[in-house]
Amino acid sequence: MTGKLATGYIEGVQSLGIGTSLKHYAVNSQETRRMTSNSQIDERTLREIYLSAFEEVVKKAKPTSVMASYNRINGEFGARNKYLLTDVLRKEWKYQGGVVSDWGAANDIVSCMKNGLTLEMPDPKGFHTDVLKEAYKDGRITDQELDNWTKNVLQNFVSLHKI
């Protein structure tokens, strides 16, 4: 039911040329300590309870972006969880849109970007562009990675007919 409702909503909004953000991906079911909690979950429960609606929406409605959750999932923060962001979302579900952090959730921006994030929402101190520039200068970020992230962000605007 959740997947069907969200799919219809996202398709309707995006038909007007307005981008959408599907959130909070994934296993975000509490507000208490949501920035520090660690959701320990087995694969079957993850797939059947927490990911099934996301999968339906991603595959059918193709939202402009997916927002990663604050919490840790099996020890790794949502915004840098390679398994969820790259292996499941990108490779398995073939998602092409943007993957964005929640506000202030990119607590290791280089690791977040390398593990599947494409856009950071800032924390109270702002964006971490200096950290990314330094990582590029010292070779921790490659030209290909930078090109892929930039292409992804620009494709979102093109998909909405904004450029």
Question: Language-model segments: what does each one mean?
Answer:
Residues 1-163:
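Glycoside hydrolase catalytic-domain context in secreted enzymes
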